[in-house]
Amino acid sequence: MHYAYFYLMSIIKRRYFIRESERKDLFKKFAEKLGVNPEKLFGVKPKIEVIFINKGKIFVINGRPVLMDLEGNLIPTLVFEEIIQKLPKVIVDMGAIPHICNGADIMAPGIVRIGGEFKEGDLALILDEKHGKAIAVARALLSSENIRALKRGKVFENLHYVGDLAWRVIKEETRGK
């Protein structure tokens, strides 16, 4: 076994497959929050495993870690391509990336371009300027219209980013698949 496995054992608190009633509640919340019919994506009766970590829960649906519940907020993981591609895009300059990947919130000066419209509290996908790769999922603290006008200050709360605890668990879950 390699080191990462033992490290992850300390992060993962417990894991189990959820019941039908829990699945219905999760799918209802999923449809409300993300505006997509989950049964079309996953089927009528998918296998859903919940992994409890320090910050919240990761939902592994049909073997793919696609959703997270962080402090009551349901968000897609960075590997859930079907959903994150529908989120508004925010392109940040290369100087902001190390800070974002260390958990920093997104500041107005680091934003190069905003693609799409959103309101305060909506989720957005943070992309790097050079490669266009997804590096974070963040919650808007202001509307897209207001953010475009700002030159300074915090504009997004970083919820899930490349390198966080959830990301490490997700990478280990998808390794070899």
Predicted stretch roles:
Residues 6-56, 61-113, 117-120, 124-177:
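Beta-strand/loop-dominated core regions that host nucleotide or nucleotide-derived cofactor-binding catalytic loops
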